[in-house]
């Protein structure tokens, strides 16, 4: 089939697939080449909707190539900043170690005497693995009506579902690992205080040079409204707040605001609520395992294409959890 041949040629162009799919989904302007790709893709999808045939599973191949390119090859600035990133084979495993601390004790002793032994702790850490899977259907009617937009929407949303799950798991795991001590800064209220934010920034600046604060936009906005905070803002910072409603830095540390309107498929926020996280340098490693596999079944009786995205696997090792601190709100 000529259309299938053209689609396969398009799939060989790195980075093109998702750009076109995302622009079609979010109604962004296409250039001449992208319009041609969208037209070819549209004819391909409508033909599948008419015939109920896709013997080479080109929809699954399209989704698989696109999502793999975006998930495994495209940079993710925030996760790249707080984790050492890597990848291993589907059937491989890995391990890590915490930084060795000097816990040897020099005791006062009589000449020629003996003292209590002290030891160096060399702890081996195994990753915590997560495996995510997405399943859904596209109806033949939808393929005939909307053509390529049906597949573009599905592809874009599958990619976002995977990325959102990865981000949520990363911050949730670090959150669960910190239960007390100076890493936990509790505020007896619903908004951050100057004292709490100062404690967080001091903790981070004592431990790293490339630090970041991560929180929901509503708390990034609340930081600016803290009593007595305005006196610490430069004119440029005040202009930024008046324009965007958010602060971009606190005590020299970048503030990454996460939209509260953006949620996972099950309705959860992208990070736990009532939290302001701080990370000094890196908190550990994040390894992607293998690659995604996408399968499809043609269900002509119910006029649907069943799509299964499987094996989105990744593992965390929190080798430097001491570089993580959080402010908790009521």
What are these regions (language model features)?
Residues 52-132:
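Assembly/oligomerization interface modules of large self-assembling protein complexes
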Residues 131-207:
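Alpha-helical scaffold segments that mediate packing/assembly in large oligomeric complexes
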Residues 2, 28, 32-35, 50, ...:
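Alpha-helix boundary/N-cap detector
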Residues 34-38, 42-48, 229-330:
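Sequence/fold signature of self-assembling virion shell proteins
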Residues 32-39, 127-132, 168:
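Short, compositionally biased low-complexity segments
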Residues 1-55:
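N-terminal alpha-helical "arm" segments
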Residues 176-248:
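Extended, solvent-exposed, turn-rich assembly/linker loops in the middle of proteins
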Residues 6, 40-43, 62, 199, ...:
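Charge-rich, solvent-exposed alpha-helical interaction surfaces
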């Amino acid at each position: 089939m000529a259309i299938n041949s053209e689609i396969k040629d398009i799939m060989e162009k790195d980075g093109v697939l998702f750009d076109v799919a995302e622009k079609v989904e979010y109604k962004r302007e296409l250039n001449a080449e992208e319009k041609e790709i969208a037209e070819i893709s549209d004819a391909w999808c409508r033909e599948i909707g008419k015939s109920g045939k896709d013997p080479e599973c080109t929809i699954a191949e399209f989704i698989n190539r696109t999502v793999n390119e975006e998930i495994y090859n495209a940079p993710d600035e925030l996760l790249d900043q707080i984790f050492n990133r890597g990848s291993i084979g589907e059937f491989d495993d890995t391990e890590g170690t915490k930084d060795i601390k000097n816990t040897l004790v020099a005791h006062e002793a009589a000449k020629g005497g003996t003292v209590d032994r002290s030891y160096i702790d060399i702890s081996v850490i195994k990753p915590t693995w997560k495996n995510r899977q997405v399943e859904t259907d596209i109806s033949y009617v939808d393929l005939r009506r909307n053509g390529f937009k049906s597949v573009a929407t599905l592809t874009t949303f599958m990619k976002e579902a995977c990325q959102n799950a990865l981000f949520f798991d990363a911050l949730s795991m670090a959150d669960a690992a910190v239960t007390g001590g100076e890493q936990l800064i509790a505020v007896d209220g619903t908004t951050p205080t100057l004292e709490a934010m100062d404690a967080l920034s001091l903790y981070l600046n004592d431990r790293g040079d490339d630090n970041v604060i991560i929180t929901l936009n509503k708390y990034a906005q609340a930081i600016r409204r803290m009593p007595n905070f305005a006196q610490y803002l430069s004119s440029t910072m005040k202009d930024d707040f008046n324009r965007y409603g958010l602060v971009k830095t606190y005590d020299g540390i970048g503030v990454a605001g996460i939209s509260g309107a953006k949620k996972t498929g099950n309705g959860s926020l992208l990070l736990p609520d009532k939290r302001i996280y701080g990370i000094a340098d890196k908190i550990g490693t994040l390894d992607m395992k293998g690659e995604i596999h996408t399968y499809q079944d043609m269900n002509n009786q119910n006029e649907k294409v069943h799509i299964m995205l499987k094996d989105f696997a990744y593992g965390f090792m929190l080798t430097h959890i001491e570089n993580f601190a959080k402010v908790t709100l009521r």
